[in-house]
Amino acid sequence: PVIDGEPIYEEIPHGLHDENELRWKDHDVRRYAYWSVFAGSFGHTYGNNSIMQFLKPGVTGAYGAKKPWQEAMNDPGFNQMKYLKNLMLTFPFFIRVPDQTNIAGTNGERYDRAIATRGDDYLLVYNYTGRPMQIDLRKISGTRKSAWWYTAKDGKLEYIGTFDNGIHEFQHHSGYNSGNDHVLIVTDS
């Protein structure tokens, strides 16, 4: 088993040492968490600039950290990790495998890349940007499939419909934007 023990940190500068650079945000830490777990790791370590330093008032933080670590525990990414945990605990762990063959056609590059994991009767596909995806529903049991969107930032579930086996295009109605991340959930009907 593997774990990503040090991915990016929420609110740390992209270039690490230049505090004037853009900072990694909640959608960035979610991306690394979902990519890691859907690729087959047994877990993920959340990181936050202020929390990792246990930054206290009156102390100058490294990497541009400004807020006390207790306050950083209210940052969005910190509180959004529970939605990944809840999703993964909903489905059997020991039969789940990473399976990119569920993604038909071109998968995309860099942040546009979708990642899939499945069990015998369910399929989960994480999409960071909301781009259209061609998904092969024949890899899990059943001739009819039920599908939902799961919103990574708040855990909301939205029923999409029932589909026959085959390849279908899915795109979340909120459009194609970086950080517009959702999980397509498909189960045997």
Identify what each model region corresponds to.
Residues 1-27:
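Active-site clefts of carbohydrate-active enzymes
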